[in-house]
Structure formats: structure tokens, C-alpha cells
């Protein structure tokens, strides 16, 4: 059972309100449900901020799990297929990796040129090989941020 399915089980057990199919009308037809879900998410993010400020390991773990729980819950209640959407985003994120050293070199060159022209702020792009995946990752050294390959595939959502 996936985490999304566990949260679905919880929501079904407690008979929480939900919509049958996600569409833009839900914002007008179910504002109370949306506001409740959003307030739960905000509450859990605030708890995470407090836990991090206090360097509280237990409360950090709790808050992170609770954030996932309330986000999955909102997806379910809005009629969004959480596991499906997560897989779509995951596949897009994995396309940030480069399939060859040549692609990694070209990606670094792209970011270097973009920094010089001022169109992007990544000042120290570099790549490293991920032997476990036989892929290359491009990162910005000064921030540690993973950068997108020149062949990155963004998510294409439909309504």
C-alpha cells in the first residue's frame, strides 16, 4: 500500500468530504474543504519550522511525515490521483540527469554561458558521474542545487 493509499484509507475511514473528479469548479464548489486542507498544510509547515529552529529531531520527523499526510489528504479530497501525479513529477525530475559525459559537459557549458549573459544565476556549474546509475548529475557548486540537463523534460499537465 502506497503512502497515498494509506491516507485514502484514513480519509475513507473518517468519512471526510471529497469530490468525485478534480476540475476547476472545485475551487468554487468546495472552498471550505480547500481552506481546511490549506490550513492543515500551513499548520504542519509551521511545526516543521519550529522543530528546525529548536533542532528537535523527533519533531522534525513528525512534522515532515505530517506534511506528507495532509498534502496526500488534500490530493485525495480534491479527486487528484496522488500516486500517478507523483510518478509524473518523479520521471520529470529524473530527466534532470545526463545520459553521457558529453551531455553533462554541454549542460555545464549552457549554464556557464547563461551566467555570463545574466539570464541565469548559477555561477559554478560542474558535473559528476553517478556510478550507481551510470548517469551524470550537474550541480551548482556554490549552492549545491541540482541543475536540469539540457535534455530535461518538464511535466506537461492536462486539466
Q: Where are each of the predicted segments found?
A:
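Flexible "arm" and connector segments at domain edges
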Residues: 1-64, 68-159
